[in-house]
Amino acid sequence: MFDIHREELDWGGRTLTLETGKMARQADGSVLATYGDTKVLATVVSAREPKPGQDFFPLTVNYQEKTYAAGRIPGGYFKREGRPSEKETLVSRLIDRPIRPLFPEGYKCDTQVVITVLAHDLENDPDVVAMVAASAALTLSGVPFMGPVGAARVGFIDNEYVLNPTVDEVKESALELVVAGTGDAVLMVESEAKELPEEIMLGAVMFGHRHFQPVIEAIIKLAEKAAKEPRNFQPADVSEVESKVREIAEADLRAAYKIKQKQDRYAAVGAAKSKVKKYYEELALDGTKVPTAQVVSDVLKALEAKIVRWNILDDGIRIDGRDVYTVRPIVSEVGILPRAHGSALFTRGETQALVVATLGTGEDEQFIDSLEGTYKEHFLLHYNFPPFSVGETGRMGSPGRREIGHGKLAWRAIHPMLPAKHEFPYTLRVVSEILESNGSSSMATVCGTSLALMDAGVPLRRPVAGIAMGLILEGEKFAVLSDILGDEDHLGDMDFKVAGTEQGVTSLQMDIKIAGITEEIMKVALTQAKDGRVHILGEMAKALTTARAELGEHAPRIEVMKIAVDKIREVIGSGGKVIREIVEKTGAKINIEDDGTIKIASASGDAIKAAINWIKSIASEPEVGQIYEGTVVKVVDFGAFVNFFGSKDGLVHVSQMANERVAKPSDVVKEGDKVKVKLMGFDERGKTRLSMKVVDQTTGEDLEAKAKAERDAARAAAPAATGDEAGAAE
């Protein structure tokens, strides 16, 4: 019934198995990949013909994690998987990026790649396994795919590269890098690092590329046994269209791409394209067969790319007039929003990000439900890209894949520089609003986030900056471009973004569109990126060099205290009654952890102090000799009872109310009065003895201690005085 084919190899100390022919047989291609006990099923279906008028390649990649893969049931009311999680969205992009460039130009058949995690052993992250499975399924499917693609995760532990580190090993690693590519080229890199030098980062890329070659060989062997007949796809011959388009528009396009201002340049480019469109419309009116609008558009794009690329390679001059090294003018401002805890406006050329930082408490942490279990995230970074930022109208609403991906890239850049949670126990939410965009808005977000957090008083280890780089390669000639524009991103051969501090890289993202980019070229690019990053850090320093010494005026203050674990129940109370009362009466937010750590937060210092004292009164015992502020709760003939330590009461005997004789306690105090008392001790029955007369009721000073200090000072002075008098008598 089943025609099963399988390939196995030892990879990173674990067995990788690729199997086809048993599951999802009606898909064009399907592969079950097993690594350890992690199992991932990848399927590919591609339409036989493109839709009429289709003007782009409709590739969709959907990565989905099923909770049954880890033996869990989904949370929520409906108890089933819902909208994609952030991780599912990010992994979908991770798979899409290396496979998309490997489809031939002009292929426009609707193609869907679906990857499903069927089992997760909680040791081997399914994302790399999913990339391998998707590559294998595409290779077997018969669709025109110039793969296969391999992928690997690389760690850096104890100064050694580690292939496919486990989930636990990643936590100890100074680097988490995912690399994908073909047999002779790297296509995609995604990473987070702890200020590593460029040579370590590049070494990790090449290490991963070497070590996924056996995976590519296994996919090829599987394809030799089980691949479907390749589909016949021939790109249309557009040589005549190319010739005519050059004749009509090349001169105008060359002139347009010498205009430095983006909107004016776009207008001139649009006018040149309109001339071509008008020519073919008039031709069609005469009954002449003309190419489709999409063919003409594709030819125009290719001509634009050629003009821009050779202008740079021949003259070293870019679209906006810069040379290949120059970063656009930068303006950094901080503290621009009066009620925000921290804010920054970062402008680089025609790219601008308004970044706002907000500090919260443990209650504000995000609960994340993953296959590995539920955990809390205390650093959130949200990136928004409204259509007005590029002068367009468009959809507004929940974030798309691109916004989630750019936000995560900036998150990775900043995350290694955050203070440890026990040092700075705040939840941090950063929102980046892209107000203008002409390339590198994610890196503007990195720079703005660094400034906004420092403006909020978050003690980053060092400021972080990011820069987007590009590459143009034609034969032996190449040019690396610093701080690329949006047009240079689309027309170049490599787009890579590097973020970090003056000491090293914290995040690297790379997308390479062609083969032939050598290790040496990447080394040049990374070195040039470092120079650009250091320059940007210098420009940012004009606004702020380090975190402010104090938190923002409107930010909450957090104090941390510790109580015995066996006292947690008393502080919380039956059904949370006690803790709710403390919160309601003091106005402070309180978070209690299982180890007895308590975080008290409020914008008011008095509220924090009141909450701390209340909790102390429950979880600890009063100390003899200490002075406390209390409230008179009852006046009797022989004294007054004072509530002085949370729920604890003590007696101030009438003889301890004042130094002079008191006839009636009610002459001195009444119920509700605030008084200062000293704990004198406990009587034989364990009752608390308090005194008011030994405490200055205005200042709270211990009068007994003051008198003792004066007596001690007098005794110390007496011998000296006696000696002086004896000397004078002689």
Curated annotation (Swiss-Prot):
It catalyses: RNA(n+1) + phosphate = RNA(n) + a ribonucleoside 5'-diphosphate. Pfam families: KH_1, PNPase, RNase_PH, RNase_PH_C, S1. Its cofactor is Mg(2+). The keyword Lyase does not apply. Mg(2+) binds at D489, D495. PROSITE patterns: KH_TYPE_1, S1. SUPFAM superfamilies: Eukaryotic type KH-domain (KH-domain type I), Nucleic acid-binding proteins, Ribonuclease PH domain 2-like, Ribosomal protein S5 domain 2-like. InterPro entries: ExoRNase_PH_dom1, ExoRNase_PH_dom2, ExoRNase_PH_dom2_sf, KH_dom, KH_dom_type_1, KH_dom_type_1_sf, NA-bd_OB-fold, PNPase. It is found in: Cytoplasm. The keyword Glycoprotein does not apply. Its EC number is 2.7.7.8. Its main location: cytoplasm. Residues 703-714 have a biased composition (Basic and acidic residues). It comes from the Bacteria. One of its GO terms (molecular function) is 3'-5'-RNA exonuclease activity. Keywords: Cytoplasm, Magnesium, Metal-binding, Nucleotidyltransferase, RNA-binding, Transferase. Residues 700-730 are annotated as: Disordered. Residues 715-730 have a biased composition (Low complexity). Residues 625-693 form the S1 motif domain. GO terms for cellular component: cytosol. Residues 556-615 form the KH domain. GO terms for biological process: mRNA catabolic process; RNA processing. Involved in mRNA degradation. Catalyzes the phosphorolysis of single-stranded polyribonucleotides processively in the 3'- to 5'-direction. Belongs to the polyribonucleotide nucleotidyltransferase family. This is Polyribonucleotide nucleotidyltransferase.
